[in-house]
Structures are given as C-alpha cells and as structure tokens.
Curated annotation (Swiss-Prot):
Cited SMART domains: AAA (SM00382), ClpB_D2-small (SM01086)
UniProt similarity note: Belongs to the ClpX chaperone family. HslU subfamily.
Superkingdom of source: Bacteria
Compartment(s) of residence: Cytoplasm
Name recorded for this polypeptide: ATP-dependent protease ATPase subunit ClpY
InterPro entries linked: AAA+_ATPase, ATP-dep_Clp_protease_ClpX, ATPase_AAA_core, Clp_ATPase_C, HslU, P-loop_NTPase
One Gene Ontology CC term in the entry: HslUV protease complex
One Pfam family recorded for the sequence: AAA_2
Length: 467
C-alpha cells in the first residue's frame, strides 16, 4: 500500500483523468479504499472484526465498470485480477474451480513484489552483470586438469615453480586487459560487440494440456516439484552486449532476491490489499426462476463463490491465503436478469450497490477529448508518425458523439466501445492512404463526418452490420 494514502476526493480526481462521469461508482470505490487505510490504523482486535464492504456495479457494457476497478488497482499498487464468472463451473463439472481466482491473485501479488525487489537491487545486479560481460569478453585460460606422472612430480620441482610464476604473470596480464575492457564497457563502446551467453532453455511444459480443465494447479505444483529435482537445461546463445546485459541483469537480480520472503509478502499483500473484480456476474444468475440443463451449474457456481467472498482459507503454493479482507467488486449489465435473481446469500455479501448510467451525447464528447490519452489524441499520435497532423473541429467531435449515441440507441448499446468502431470507420481511408500522400495537415469537419458515416448511421440495417 502507498505510504501516503489518497483521500476519497483525490482518488475520484485521479479517476476523472481517465473515466468520464459515473461519480457514484467512483465515490463508492474511493470510500472502500479509504476504509482499508482507516482499518490499518485500528488495534488488532477491532481490525479483525472490520471486513470490506463489497461492491456490486450495475450498468450496460462500455460505461466504465471494469476501467474503474483497473485504474484503482494501478493507483494503489494493490494486487488486482479481473475474472469472468462464466469461466467457472460447479465442483464436479469440468472447468475452473472458483478457488483459482485467489491463486491468480497471489500470483499477481508475487509478480508485483518481485518487480519492486528487482528495482531495489537493480544497481547491484547491473554491476554484477557487467563483471560477467567483461569475463565473457576476456575469458581466462582454462586450467590443465589431470594427474601428473610420479617421476615428473619427483624430479620436476623447478618446472612446477616456473609454471606457477608464469601463471601469476598471465593472471596479472589478464586482469589488466579486463580493467581496460571494463573501462570501454562503462563508456558504452562495446554495446554492439557479440558475446556467447549461457541461458536456461525454455521448454514447453508437459502440463499445458491441463489448462482449463480445473487441474492446472495440480499441474503447476507437479511442475515445480520436478523442476527442483531435474536440473534445467542450458544452451549458449550469441547476442550483443546490450542484450546480454538485460539477460544477465535479470539472472543476477534473481540471485539477490529471497523468493521465500517474496512469497510471504505476496500472501500478506493479497490478504490485506487484494482486489478481485468479478465480471459478468449477471450471467450466472437464474433468469426468471426457469431452470434448464444448459444452466444447471449456475446456482452451483454462486454457492461456490459464496465462501470465497464471505471469507475462507485457500491453499496456494506460497501458503494459505485468507480472503476475509480481500475487496470483491462484482459487475454485470443485468439486462436479462436482476440482482435479485442472485441467491440471497450472495446478494447479502455485496452490500454496496451502484448503478452506472448510460452514456449521453455530452459524455461521448468528453470521452473523445478529456481523459489523458483520449481516443482522438491516440489517433492523432498514430497519424503523426506518417507526418500528418490531424485536427478535429468542435462541431465534428459533436457530430461523431451524436452518431455514436444514435447507433447505440438504434442497435445494441455497447457504450464507449462504439466510439472505437465509429472512429475506425471514419479514418479508414485516411489511415490506408497516409504513407503515400504528402499532406501535412488534415482537418476533420462535420461535412467529412457526414460523408463517411451519414448513410450508414441513418440506415438501421446497415449500422447493425458495419457500426
């Protein structure tokens, strides 16, 4: 967690840089995060009693449900995973079991902490890597192995002394060469020289066939056990000094990091700061109470998710993980089902409910221009690489937003994702011709938008297939 936790207002302000509108959802998530910090300041007895208030987000696709959770995780540096409820099956059926979401969370936590530890030891690792590169550039003489014959040992005393003296001189000469080479390396004069580096051979896992069968965890555990018994194969690869430095720095960093400590920290961070985003939760709700063989395991999946959400212990290869204080954010469009179609026990585990509103024309205008790295900025940057400066008039931006809104209303509402389709269609010809034309500046006007999109947008049948 951050040393200086953000206040709820600061969190909302940060989210506003990337996501337009949806203030209720932003506030709910901001308060949930701040409560984690407040809880950490309490004494241990009371701290154990306070559990996070899980959030259920309801709203059509493409309005920012997933993005809010993803941005929150980046802001806090918390382990975050997004999973889809439809991927899981009830115990007894072929497929992933719900406990795998906790194992995935711990793996994410391990990766985060490993990256932090690597950044801490990066200087030392680079220094060690440079020393190895110098030894590769100026290899030492291989010592003669083998037993001398007895007569040589008895009568060749002077020869042995001479050999030792020659070895010392050679060693001194070698050290001098390596010092010169290290100096050249520090100046960056040897970056394109080639060296032969011994690296671990990446072999396909024999347990890949278990993926998606619900037995992948067993496969991973067996693979770990076997990797400790069987030494890893190594092969020599020829690469530039620049590439070798990256490979060897990673190797050296791995030697400096205590993976047992990383595992312990990862479990603790996953328990205290983990966020699990369960998408498409409406798809496992029973629709209208009618049951069929096709959705026989929907309620079973809900019942399997229930103990994870309310707090249980899951065994992972890094240790046991308690889910009591993991924050769960569930989301769904709920256009075919209602939150009340979920089993009552699961409904009770998501006390905070937030409805995200549909996007208006004004929202589409803001999405196009306001966020950091907004869509229009992305397209402008892409075409700038071809030497074309792309400019959108305010009226053209408004027109694009109106087209996106009306197509959403007339066909399926896919929210802000509709803008990707609209802009690709609008700029298709320009993107295709860009490398071959000599235009420096292109202005996108309402007339241009109407010319490219008007016919398709106004024809409901066409827009269903093209936009």
């Amino acid at each position: 967690m951050e040393n200086k936790p953000l206040t709820p207002r600061q969190i909302v302000d940060r989210l506003d840089q990337y996501i337009v509108g949806q203030q209720d959802a932003k506030k709910a998530v901001a308060v949930a995060l701040r409560n984690r910090y407040r809880r950490s300041l309490l004494d241990e007895k009371l701290r154990d009693e306070i559990v996070p208030k899980n959030i259920l987000m309801m709203g059509p696709t493409g309005v920012g449900k997933t993005e809010i959770a993803r941005r929150i995780a980046k802001l806090t540096g918390a382990p975050f995973i997004k999973i889809e409820a439809t991927k899981f099956t009830e115990v007894g059926y072929v497929g992933r079991d719900v406990e795998s979401m906790v194992r995935d969370l711990v793996e994410t936590s391990v990766r985060l902490i490993k990256e932090e530890k690597i950044s801490e030891v990066k200087e030392q690792a680079e220094e060690n890597a440079n020393k190895r590169i110098v030894r590769l550039l100026v290899p030492g003489k291989k010592k003669q192995a083998g037993v001398k014959n007895p007569f040589e040992m008895l009568f060749g005393g002077n020869q042995a002394a001479n050999d030792d003296e020659a070895d010392q001189q050679e060693e001194a000469s070698l050290e001098e060469k390596r010092k010169r080479m290290a100096h050249q390396l520090a100046l960056g004069e040897l970056e394109d020289h080639y060296v032969s580096v011994e690296v671990e051979e990446q072999q396909p896992s024999m347990f890949d066939m278990l993926q998606g069968s619900g037995m992948e965890q067993m496969g991973m555990n067996m693979q770990d056990a076997l990797s400790n018994l069987v030494p890893k194969k190594k092969k020599r690869r020829k690469m530039t000094v620049r590439e070798a430095r990256k490979v060897l720095t990673n190797e050296e960093a791995g030697k400096l990091i205590d993976m047992d400590e990383v595992g312990q920290e990862a479990v603790l961070r996953a328990e205290e700061g983990g966020i699990i985003f369960i998408d498409e939760i409406d798809k496992i709700a029973k629709n209208g109470g009618a049951s069929s063989s096709a959705d026989v395991s929907r309620e079973g999946v809900q019942r399997d998710i229930l103990p994870i959400v309310e707090g249980s212990t899951v065994v992972t290869k890094y240790g046991s993980v308690k889910t009591d204080h993991v924050l769960f954010i569930a989301a769904g469009a709920f256009h075919m089902a209602k939150p009340s179609d979920l089993i009552p026990e699961l409904q009770g585990r998501f006390p905070i409910r937030v409805e995200l509103s549909k996007l208006t024309v004004d929202d589409f205008v803001k999405i196009l221009v306001e966020p950091d790295n907004a869509l229009l900025k992305q397209y402008q940057a892409l075409l700038q690489t071809e030497g074309i400066s792309l400019e959108f008039s305010d009226e053209a931006i408004r027109k694009i937003a109106e087209v996106a809104y009306h197509v959403n209303q007339d066909t399926d509402n896919i929210g802000a994702r509709r803008l990707h389709t609209i802009l690709e269609r609008l700029l298709e010809d320009l993107s295709f011709e860009a490398p071959d034309v000599t235009m420096e500046k292109v202005a996108i006007t309402p007339q241009y938008v109407e010319e490219k999109l008007g016919t398709i947008a106004n024809n409901k049948d066409l827009s269903q297939f093209i936009l």
